[in-house]
Amino acid sequence: MKRAGGGVDFISSLPDEILHHILANTPTKLAIRTSVLSKRWKHVWYETPSISIVCNRVDPDSLNKTLSSYSTPKIKSFDVTISRDVTVPEIDTWINLALSRKAENVSLRFTSHYRFRDTFFINSSLKQLSLTLVYCILNPKCVVSWSSLRNLSLNRCKVSDDSIAKILTGCSLLESLTLNLCDRLNDLDLSKSLSLRRLEILGDRWTPERIVAPHIRYLRLENYQRPSTLVDVSSLTEANLGLSKHVLDYFTCEMETESLQYMVRQTVVKLQNIKKLTIGGIFLQILSLAELCGVTLPVFQNSISKL
């Protein structure tokens, strides 16, 4: 294979391992197209350790037929975005592919109604999992066993207190947890997650009312309607707090305003001894108003910065 103008095609002369690395950073749809370049490229993508699928205009049947040729025994990264209606068996096929090839990093984004099979919750290969489930309820009926999982990100998931507790019980090595716009959570108890060091909660009116997280070192907490009550964050060293400007729309009368000031004060009381605290403008505005109203605020021993 030569380039136009008679030059040598150095890329095709590279070892398979390097070509696999190149294709691993390419959407699977484009990686598959390289198979028509020459005989040298015909089977290269079959053993690429990463799959990235965006299913919006792609025909699922055609995609499944193509993926049936995928032969690598081990997947490092599996990323699927489904922004169109597909059938449950089609989703099952893609997830089973990831599970059967022992994928380590899995990212799934669904806008279809779907219920995960029990086999999804029993996996010793997963190290990083990100789920964006617009219409799905995450409610495992079996015992969860994600024994190698270290990073978990749940986005737009409907997950109850009992369900998150069951999930976390099966993640003994979990170090980082992100909850983004997840509803149905009231009490988030992370006291049994001994390895958890990082917690990020980005929410709206459905953010947890109470947070028990005695082992975390870093907390990012951005709420919409109200601050969460920090029951135990005794190991915390750094926090990032923010409130949406819309929070002021929900606290209009004098009694509600005083309640908001009290909740914000109680939050910062829990954080007065941490090494680094970053607060957003609305949060700072409420603190300043509370001080003007005679509310006693804690004295911070370390650095505070504003977003």
From Swiss-Prot:
GO cellular component: peroxisome
Pfam families: F-box, LRR_At1g61320_AtMIF1
Cited InterPro entries: F-box-like_dom_sf, F-box_AtFBL13-like, F-box_dom, F-box_plant, LRR_At1g61320_AtMIF1, LRR_dom_sf
Highest taxon of the lineage: Eukaryota
Transmembrane segments: none
Cited CDD domains: F-box_AtFBL13-like
Domain F-box, residue spans: 8-54
PROSITE patterns with a match to the protein in the record: FBOX (PS50181)
Protein's recorded name: F-box protein At5g03100
